[in-house]
């Protein structure tokens, strides 16, 4: 693990524990890795018929139910209006991108060539996400996809440290206000830098909050806020 990621993970643990400090006995969190699966539309595919769509969705939900039953799925649900053809996000409690990819290869929509999985290792606190009360009883939350914009400015030394400190301070403020459930970085050095999961569904409020982040102001990060319908009780 590189030093910068290590500092970020430590800070995330501190901010989540700090947000829980109002409790008599605040929980202690440790960081672990999950696999974030983004199911994306395959370009050029035609819309399936209603009967076929029902069959594929039944297979999709049956697989998710089995994964939840084994403790291999922690969170899942469709996204509304995400960029890049992303239709659904799934958080898997498995140890590697390869394992997650193997599981998703068995997904009904993927087998039919309608969706393709994009898998990222995600660092986050253990024990925040809870088993669903019922897979088909949903509730809305907001997924924040944190990306590095094309042509983002490069900084080093004290300037970069100041931006990172301000970034973490803003995350802590969002957690302390109760808007943010969990946050964490991606394990790889790509365009997708991390994700936020918000219980607050007021996107205008959340847009104002993330806009206060010095790294966003400096053009180093951008955050796409996407409505996400997840099983009730998970967040």
Describe each region flagged by the PLM:
Residues 8-18:
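Bacterial N-terminal signal peptides
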